[in-house]
């Protein structure tokens, strides 16, 4: 490799590449979440018949993974570059390899492997066929073909490509610690994020108010239900995300037992399923506006039979 791309140049390169493939460039969704998959730009849009092609960076919070800024590769918050394409292009893997070339990684000069790793997210009732992508022995990307989202079968199938930006940048810049990644010219990743990493880790493991979090979970769950009773999908899903993050904080604090853990996950999953069903019904009521006219008319006629 010649010039080593900065973190933000990696993002810009991926944005330009997937823009050229017809993806809309979305912005990170303004609610805490554990993965880019949980953004409504993936979770909601992966279900139903309408096409959807989008790419976005998603800061992803995982309280239990915090290490006070002392671990070079494990983080409370990391960044994913998320690509979702529905229906899935037949050449999605070739497009992915081409995107690596744009980053200066020649597939012919490196050991790139697709290792089977089927994906499941119990808290949202989602699952799919998947592969980890290993670059010279290090996982840098997760590939998934969604089979089920929010408890609903997907059709057409959505392809998801999730780049782990910190791992990718560490490889490209040849650094051993995420904190040594150059975010922009002259500015290191650690200069931006090491203090937040320490503080969020301390909060998640030592300081968070368990009683408050338990109460908040119940309140968020109730409010999601109220929004759904009014047919308000997006506010309801915001509260599902709040439930998920609150549970993750409780889990990091060790505030829930193994039995209770399963119960909380089931409560989140039940809400997510109702959100998914309500969203599909809403899109049908609106007449599937993202479908081309011929397909839209045909599908609405079939639904009316």
UniProtKB/Swiss-Prot annotation:
Extract the HAMAP family matched here: Gly_tRNA_synth_alpha
Organism classification = Bacteria, Bacillati, Bacillota, Bacilli, Lactobacillales
Give the top-rank taxon of the lineage listed in the UniProt record for this protein: Bacteria
A Gene Ontology molecular function term for this protein is: transferase activity
The listed locations are: Cytoplasm
Record-given protein name: Glycine--tRNA ligase alpha subunit
Gene3D superfamilies, per database record: Bira Bifunctional Protein, Domain 2, Class II aaRS and biotin synthetases, domain 2
PROSITE patterns this protein is in?
Answer: AA_TRNA_LIGASE_II_GLYAB
Record bears the keyword Nucleotide-binding? yes
Q: Name one GO biological process term.
A: glycyl-tRNA aminoacylation
**Sorted alphabetically, which keywords does the UniProt record give?**
Aminoacyl-tRNA synthetase, ATP-binding, Cytoplasm, Ligase, Nucleotide-binding, Protein biosynthesis
EC number(s) stated in the UniProt entry for this protein: 6.1.1.14
């Amino acid at each position: 490799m010649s010039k080593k791309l900065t973190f933000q140049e990696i993002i810009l390169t991926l944005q330009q590449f997937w823009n050229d493939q017809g993806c809309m460039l979305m912005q990170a969704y303004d609610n805490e979440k554990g993965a880019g998959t949980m953004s409504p730009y993936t979770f909601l849009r992966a279900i139903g018949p309408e096409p959807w092609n989008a790419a976005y960076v998603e800061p992803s919070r995982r309280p239990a993974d915090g290490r006070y800024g002392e671990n070079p590769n494990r983080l409370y918050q990391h960044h994913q570059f998320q690509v979702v394409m529905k229906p899935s292009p037949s050449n999605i893997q070739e497009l992915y390899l081409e995107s690596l070339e744009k980053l200066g990684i020649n597939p012919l000069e490196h050991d790139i492997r697709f290792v089977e790793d089927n994906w499941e997210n119990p808290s949202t009732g989602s699952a799919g066929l998947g592969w980890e992508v290993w670059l010279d022995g290090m996982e840098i990307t997760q590939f998934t073909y969604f089979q089920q989202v929010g408890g609903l079968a997907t059709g057409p199938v959505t392809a998801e490509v999730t780049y782990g930006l910190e791992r990718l940048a560490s490889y490209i810049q040849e650094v051993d610690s995420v904190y040594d990644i150059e975010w922009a010219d002259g500015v290191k990743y650690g200069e931006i994020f090491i203090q937040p990493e320490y503080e969020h880790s301390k909060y998640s493991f030592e300081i968070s108010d368990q009683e408050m979090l338990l109460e908040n979970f119940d309140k968020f769950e109730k409010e999601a239900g109220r929004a759904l009773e009014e047919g308000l999908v997006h506010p309801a899903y915001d509260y599902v995300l709040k439930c998920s993050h609150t549970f993750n904080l409780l889990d990091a604090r060790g505030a829930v037992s193994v039995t209770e853990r399963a119960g909380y996950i089931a409560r989140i999953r039940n809400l997510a399923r109702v959100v998914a069903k309500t969203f599909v019904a809403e899109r049908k009521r609106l007449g599937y506006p993202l479908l081309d006219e011929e397909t839209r008319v045909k599908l609405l006629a079939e639904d009316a039979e």
